[in-house]
Structures are given as structure tokens and as C-alpha cells.
Amino acid sequence: MKRRSIFMYYCFCFLLKYVAFSNVPNPNTTIGHFEICEVNTSSGDAEECVLENEFGKMFLFICDIDYNEMSKNIVLPSECAKKTYIDHVNPNGTSPEVNTYDIFPDLIAANESQFRDKFYFYGTPYSSKDIDFICLCFSETKPDIKHVMKMSFKKMTKKIKGCDFGDNIPTKKDLTNGKALYENSSCHIYAYPGDVIGINCYKKDINNIYNNNLELQPNNCFHNVYYEDDILLSSKNLIPNSRVIPDPSNDVKLSKMHSYMSYIILPDEINENVKISCACKRDEYIGTMFLYVNTSKNILTSPDNNVEEIAPLNDHYISIGDMWDMGLHENPEQIQGIISNHANKKYYEHMKIYKSNKMDSSDDDESNETESSENESNERTHNGNRANKDANNSEKMTGNRRKKNNSINNTNYYSNYEDDNGINISTHDKYYEDQHFGNNGPLRKKRTFWQNMFGTSSSYYEVFNYFSIAFILIIHMLLL
């Protein structure tokens, strides 16, 4: 009986804590690309603002104060958002602070308010982990009532199309293609309506000498871009309705690290194909990003073309960028002339012979029908076998290249591998999970005891629901 009483007492205290002292969630207000959440420090109840990450959004936390009371608000950590509390259910002034950018370098945030009552954040295009960043805001006249400002990020499986010239390790890289500026290099990205494209020059390690003498060219890429290699034009005019993050405004003063990265959001409709570029420069070395923006994903096909004739074409055999430079994206019929001199030439020749023999067989003389039928059958079988053999060899070669490329990417992610035909495989678009060096398995996040029991959410409202259900079940069992 005594044990049961003690157990009931602790359960009551637990419920009292979460019912009587839980924060009041505040609704968010959306205006254009802004999502705004406000807490009132003069309130007698602890309020909580939660903003879920969404790329393309700008988040604004307002720690409102009552100027009539002439009180001053206090923010913890004092350097929010450079330092924050991470994944705390109910942080307080004694909770450990962490350097936000060491844990999550992709967060773009700043505070330029003289009274420290407004905090700006950009939604990030990629997150390698589930994580919550928390700052506290309260009035000096009510220090016991601490209001919560929380930014919540969910793990994403796909990285963003783009070029990272910062020599970053996979866990700190949010773009698909990695390069190091120890030599001149180039990176080719093929983009389509609705895509998000990024470029980064910065090595995401604080005070790393790699970041000395860095330069983004143009310095406000993608707001301005190079067209035809040397003509500086506005992306708004080249790609109407596109949007660049961060935008050129006084809302957020970018840190040094975030001054060397940029993203462009392509519109859902693109009327013209266009080739643009930006570059990263480190000392005498330049890494150039070539961005091929297409009106649709099927730039090599047209309504008059047979899809079967185009389907075997593969980036490992012929570069789409080369076709673009030669103007072939506007005249797909010329592609067949290139293919005839390419690695899969025999496959097309045999298929052409097969089709012509099939059509000619219907015009043969009836007296030679049997002989012609046998010859046609033999030739069809012979050519068909050769075609199948060449097709299988083609697929096998592609598979070997992909396996070899994946192996090299896992062991040395910044190596620049070229296959037998001289095509730089590492510069082609590819999505992959963060991986250990030399290990094909994805990185695994360490989970706490409570996350193993109740999931990875850091919201104590969800934890409270679980405990409430468990408490009711226990009471029910005790009363039986």
C-alpha cells in the first residue's frame, strides 16, 4: 500500500508539472514570404513560439515588451542565435549553451535589433539531422516566466543540386557536388522548373586557413550571374519569377560564412533554356559552376522523335553539356549523327538493319518466299543477338562505371575521376545519403533513452500525451 501511495504521488507531481506549468503555444502569422511569431513578455503565462523549417521562408521571432512599464527584456543565451539551447524540453538560464553554427552550419540567422527583441532566420534547404534550436525571452520584472522561441528542423534525405567548392566533409555539405580549390575546376548542373540550386565557397570550419582570400564571383551570385561566360546580367531578367536566398535586403546582415553561399529557387514555368555561371576563387584557383536551366526535363526529345531511339542515350557516353554548347538541344535530329560515332554505334546500326529487313520482307517475290524467310530469320536472329549483346555490354559498362564511381566517392569524396571516355562522372548530378568514408552505410544518429521510448520529437506535449495514456492504464490496472 505504501509503494502504491508513493507511486501515485510521483504521478500526480508529474502531471501537475505539465498541466500547470506548460507553455501556451502562440499561433504564427504568415505575410508573403515571412512567417512571424510573437511572445509577450508582460504576459503572466509562459508562451512558446515554434517555427517549422521551410526553405524559401523567412522567420521572424518578436520578443515583445511593454514600453509603458519601462521594463527591459532579457534574452538567453545572450548571443542568440549564434549560441542556442539544443533539443531541451524545458530550458532555463542554467542550461548548457552550444555554438549553433558548429552544430548546424547551414542555419542563416542574425539579430541586428538594438533592443534585442527581433530575431531573423532563413529556412534552410537541407538538414542532416532532426534538431531544435531554442532561445528564451523574458522581462526583467518577471524573471520566473520565461518564454520560448524555437526553430525546428527535420532531417532530409536528398541533398540540394549544386556545387560545393569549400572542401567540406559530407556531414557539413548540403550540395550534391563537392570540389576543392587546390586547382582550377568546373562543375556542371542541369536544372529544371521548380529546382533549388546552390553554390558554396566556404569551408565550414571556424578560422580555417582555407577561407583566407576567398571570393564569390559575382559577389552577389545568384542575384547577378554570368551569361555566355563574361556578360553580367540579373537573374530576374534571365529567369523571371526566380528567387534568390539570401535576398538583398537589410533584414539580415550575413555572417562571413553565409556571404559565400547562395541559393536560387527556379519557378514552376521556364520559357527559355539558358546557360549561366558563377565561380568561387581562392588565391589563384577558380572553381566555376555552369548551370544549364531547361524548360523541361526531356530536352533531348520532341513529339516527332521515337522515344526508343533516344532512350539508350546515357550521360556516361555523351555529355549533355557538350550537346548544349553545340546547340543540339534546339535540334534533336542532329543527335543521331553524334550517336553514330559513339560507343553504342553498333546497337543503332543493327536495329536499323533489323527494321529495314522487316519492311523489305513484305515485298519479296512469292517464289522466293521460303528462301527469303529463312535468310531474313537468320539475319534477324544474328543481328538481334548482336544488338542484344551490345546492349547488354552497354548496360554492363554503365553499371561498372557507376560502381567504380560510387566506390571512389565513398573512399575519397573530392577525387576527380574520369572514366575511359574522358567524361567527368563526379560532376554529374547525384543524390546520396551522408556516408562514412569507406563505408556504404548511412550515418546513424545517436538516440537518447527518451527518444527510444517516445520518438525523436523534442516537444514535451507529445511526451505528455504518452505519459497521460500510461498513467490512465496504470490506474485502471490498480483498480481492477
Swiss-Prot record:
Residues 358-415 are annotated as: Disordered. Residues 406-415 have a biased composition (Low complexity). A lipid is attached at S457 (GPI-anchor amidated serine). Residues 1-22 form the signal peptide. It is found in: Cell surface; Cell membrane. It is a lipid-anchor; GPI-anchor. Residues 362-376 have a biased composition (Acidic residues). Glycans are attached at N28, N40, N92, N111, N184, N294, N368, N375, N392, N405, N409, N424. Pfam families: s48_45. Disulfide bonds join C37-C49, C63-C137, C80-C135, C163-C187, C201-C280, C221-C278. GO terms for cellular component: cell surface; plasma membrane; side of membrane. Disruption phenotype: Cells lacking both P36 and P52/P36P show attenuated infection and do not form a parasitophorous vacuole within hepatocytes. Residues 377-393 have a biased composition (Basic and acidic residues). This is Sporozoite surface protein P36p. Residues 23-156, 159-298 form the 6-Cys domain. Keywords: Cell membrane, Disulfide bond, Glycoprotein, GPI-anchor, Lipoprotein, Malaria, Membrane, Repeat, Signal. Involved in sporozoite infection of hepatocytes and replication therein. Residues 458-480 form a propeptide.
